[in-house]
Amino acid sequence: MEFIVFLDRIEIEIIRIVEEAGYSIKENSSLCLLSEKYAGFLIKKDKKIVICTDNAKKREGYTNRSNQNIDIFERTAIHIKKALRHEAVHVAQECNNGNLLEINKKLSINKAKFDALRGSKDISGEEEKERQAYILEDKPKLLKEKLEKYCL
């Protein structure tokens, strides 16, 4: 899986918990071809996260690691890490019997994510779960805690 090179230690720990919970992680499935704007999916019935590495690379202008400036690599990494974390929030929600996670009500979604929230809601039909995923994708330590609480 190519996307691993873009991750930090906390995302590797998140993957371990997700896999312990019985989920698999795949890369660049046919779902990614729906649109280059999609960076990840959770296929609930198959217990599978899909990371659209190629879409993230195209979106950020990444071609290859040896011929790249650090800024493009970092932007691509952020895109992939957030996609993994976002889908991992949905895993935690599934581990919580499909319910929202208990988080501080004062946490709010970054306004820059409103368009993405609309797109995700259109696919999943679950606005509050998507809102929570967009909030927690920026909080990897809190996400890890929630995965441990609900999935292990």
Indicate where each model-derived feature is located.
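Catalytic Zn2+-binding segment of zinc metalloproteases
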Residues: 87-104
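Metalloprotease/metallohydrolase-associated module, dominated by Zn2+-dependent proteases
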Residues: 102-152
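Zn2+-dependent metallopeptidase catalytic core
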Residues: 6-27
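Soluble non-cytosolic domains of exported or imported proteins
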Residues: 8, 74-83, 123-128
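Short, aliphatic-rich beta-strand segments
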Residues: 48-53
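Extracellular/periplasmic catalytic domains that process cell-envelope and extracellular macromolecules
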Residues: 41-45
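Acidic helix-start/capping segments at beta-turn-to-alpha-helix junctions
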Residues: 30-38, 104-111
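Short pre-active-site segment immediately N-terminal to the catalytic Zn-binding motif
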Residues: 56-84
